């Protein structure tokens, strides 16, 4: 992915400046104790699990933002902070997570690294549940925005057909998920998944194959309900379009927020 491209750079500086102002005014803070001191002592790499928390308006829900990077990097600059800025400007609380990658996950094989990364997301949700009052968030009413690898993590946490899903770890499921160019193309909805709403966009030209999720849509819609699945596959769209600036989907974010609000009720 060419992260220096126009798709990303125009949003990046504004997002960093916005975050800097929030940190200075006390409206944003780095959370570095998601894993306990004991866990970090046992495995120092676990100190790499952190979150930048943006405090939103009272009564507005929380968005957890999970950037991608193929489990070899964290693309927070493109898929984290610009998204968080847009959400926070609308009043939402936001947690942008940065998670261990590569050998830090304790695995060498790519698929196992992905599974280990899902367990990092589990730990984030556990932390949020334990700190609801302190952070003024309601974990019965939250969403996850995941991009690329982060979208795979979001899928695997939210759907019951995965090993480390919310049901199995007994943690709250998001009301709505947004696995952008990241909805697992093998996803399968089970009865337990009823009540979950899914919004996703991918391109047919996606070089990692995320457009292949199209074949799963009839099954998803039959279980979750037509109104709860907004997944679109576009021609002439590749991977890694971030917030969508200068692409054929410049308004996906506004559509996503509309979908979220419609499914909070």
Question: What annotation goes with each model-predicted range?
Answer:
Residues 77-95:
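Short amphipathic alpha-helix adjacent to the substrate-entry channel of hydrolases
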Residues 168-226, 230:
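The feature captures the conserved acid-bearing segment of alpha/beta-hydrolase catalytic domains
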Residues 75, 100-135, 246-249:
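Catalytic nucleophile-loop/oxyanion-hole region of alpha/beta-hydrolase
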Residues 67-72, 204:
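Active-site glycine-rich loops that stabilize anionic/oxyanionic intermediates
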Residues 60-68:
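Short beta-strand element of the alpha/beta-hydrolase
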Residues 2-9:
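Short, small-residue-biased leader/transition segments that mark boundaries at the very start
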């Amino acid at each position: 992915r060419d992260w220096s491209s126009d798709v990303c750079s125009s949003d990046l500086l504004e997002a960093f400046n916005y975050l800097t102002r929030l940190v200075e005014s006390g409206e944003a803070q780095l959370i570095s104790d998601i894993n306990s001191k004991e866990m970090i002592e046992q495995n120092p790499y676990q100190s790499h699990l952190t979150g930048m928390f943006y405090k939103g308006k009272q009564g507005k829900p929380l968005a957890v933002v999970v950037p991608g990077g193929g489990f070899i990097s964290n693309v927070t600059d493109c898929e984290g902070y610009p998204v968080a800025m847009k959400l926070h400007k609308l009043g939402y609380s936001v947690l942008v997570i940065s998670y261990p990658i590569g050998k830090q996950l304790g695995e060498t094989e790519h698929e196992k690294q992905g599974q280990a990364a899902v367990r990092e997301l589990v730990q984030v949700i556990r932390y949020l549940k334990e700190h609801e009052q302190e952070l003024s968030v309601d974990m019965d009413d939250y969403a996850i925005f995941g991009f690329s690898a982060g979208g795979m993590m979001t899928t695997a946490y939210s759907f019951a057909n995965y090993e480390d899903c919310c049901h199995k770890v007994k943690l709250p499921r998001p009301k709505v998920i947004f696995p952008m160019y990241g909805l697992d193309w093998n996803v399968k909805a089970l009865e337990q998944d009823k009540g979950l709403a899914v919004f996703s966009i991918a391109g047919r030209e996606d070089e990692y194959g995320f457009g292949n999720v199209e074949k799963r849509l009839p099954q998803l819609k039959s279980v979750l309900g037509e109104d709860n699945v907004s997944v679109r596959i576009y021609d002439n769209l590749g991977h890694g379009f971030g917030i969508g600036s200068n692409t054929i989907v410049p308004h996906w974010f506004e559509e996503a927020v509309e979908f979220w609000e419609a499914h909070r009720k």
